[in-house]
């Protein structure tokens, strides 16, 4: 799996007069899992969509593997995204969902079937290839969505609040699965959540956002033990208030 550093250089995103991301500079180190954490409306999902190419920055630069991708369309960025809603095709089997992206780039059938089966094994869904999404639990559907993203071997893997539709017990299990897969593949991963426990449990680095800017960034232990301001202290955990 390819590894790539992602850099924001003075990224600003405005929607009319509303500033969603305000002059943000940060880096997402190659091969690590970085979480963008913050309350609703803080700019974390907009930042993720800018990396994916689903939104264009108003100003600033995005670098992926030292390549300026600021104006590149999403299809040319070598980035895969796992959405909150899973976004599986209901009329396709599991293996048809997983192999869809490979078919779109004209990989031959024998190769895309083989790669898809290997990827399903990686996400612990071996033997599920002929099932339909409606026959799967929420956690299994999420794993299919992860498999569909990683089968393309992207430079960067993006997650937009992937566990918000799951119950608490399943959330814990699936987040552990995501972290295990990320470490096994070594793919640069950027993960958006508003759940502090989730962020602290799986991340190499956490970037806390508030009001369109970065409130603090660092490893989970440092953020928890040494919050820089009251907002971070309150948001990360009651123990620091």
Question: Predicted regions: what is each one?
Answer:
Residues 37-39:
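The feature captures the beta-strand-to-loop junction immediately N-terminal to the Walker
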Residues 45-48, 144:
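ABC ATPase nucleotide-binding domain helices that frame the ATP-binding cleft
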Residues 10-12, 23-25, 151:
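Conserved N-terminal beta-strand of ABC nucleotide-binding domains
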Residues 60-68:
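Conserved ABC transporter NBD signature motif
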Residues 76-80, 84-231:
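ABC ATPase nucleotide-binding domains
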Residues 52:
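Helix-to-loop junction immediately C-terminal to a conserved catalytic motif
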């Amino acid at each position: 799996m390819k590894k790539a550093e992602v850099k924001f250089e003075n990224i600003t995103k405005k929607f009319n007069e509303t500033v969603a991301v305000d002059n943000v500079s940060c880096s997402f180190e190659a091969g690590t899992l970085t979480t963008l954490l913050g309350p609703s409306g803080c700019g974390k999902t907009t930042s993720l969509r800018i990396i994916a190419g689903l939104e264009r920055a108003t100003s600033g630069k995005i670098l992926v593997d030292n390549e300026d991708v600021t104006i590149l369309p999403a299809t040319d960025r070598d980035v895969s995204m796992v959405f909150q809603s899973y976004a599986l095709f209901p009329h396709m089997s599991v293996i048809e969902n997983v192999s869809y992206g490979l078919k779109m780039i004209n990989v031959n059938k024998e190769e895309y079937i083989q790669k898809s089966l290997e990827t399903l094994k990686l996400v612990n869904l071996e033997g599920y290839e002929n099932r339909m999404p409606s026959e799967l639990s929420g956690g299994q559907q999420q794993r299919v969505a992860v498999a569909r993203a990683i089968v393309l071997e992207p430079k960067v893997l993006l997650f937009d609040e992937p566990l918000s539709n799951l119950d608490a017990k399943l959330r814990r299990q699936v987040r552990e699965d995501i972290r295990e897969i990320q470490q096994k593949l070594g793919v640069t991963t950027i993960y958006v959540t508003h759940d502090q426990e989730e962020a602290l449990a799986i991340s190499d680095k956490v970037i806390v956002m508030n009001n369109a800017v970065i409130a603090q960034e660092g490893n989970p232990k440092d953020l928890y033990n040494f919050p820089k301001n009251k907002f971070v202290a309150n948001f990360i955990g009651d123990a620091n208030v």
